């Protein structure tokens, strides 16, 4: 099994409008690796960074990012670290949470609550009845 860095996924997924020769070679190599049938491993942080790059750098809409991530995770040869937490995070993301906030909550399900000063995430998580509950610490 080969663990993949985020840049491999970005090259395989994103079609640059005017790619240079190096980008074209990297895209071909990334696509060849992903279509080889060999098992590949994605860490939680790679998935988190991929969401950020697609949304923040390439300015893809949330729905596009969600579709890309769900399609990627459905590929049989891809083994995902903490896959259940990633799927839960994608559901929170679909419902309007920031992906990182949704991922924090999904990975903290075993906790009684999560402390955060992010009032927007707190309000949305509460409205969606997500677990664990988010609490804003008081002085």
Locate the predicted segments by residue:
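Generic helix-packing signal
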Residues: 10, 34, 54-55, 93, ...
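Active-site neighborhoods of divalent-metal-dependent phosphate/nucleic-acid chemistry enzymes
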Residues: 28, 57, 62, 75-120
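Alpha-helix/helix-capping structural signal
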Residues: 7-8, 45, 119-120
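Glycine/proline-rich, flexible active-site/cofactor-binding loop segments
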Residues: 67-73
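Acidic, PIN/NYN-like endoribonuclease modules and their adjacent C-terminal/linker elements
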Residues: 1, 105-139
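Short, well-structured N-terminal submotif of metal-dependent ribonuclease cores
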Residues: 1-42, 57-63, 129-139
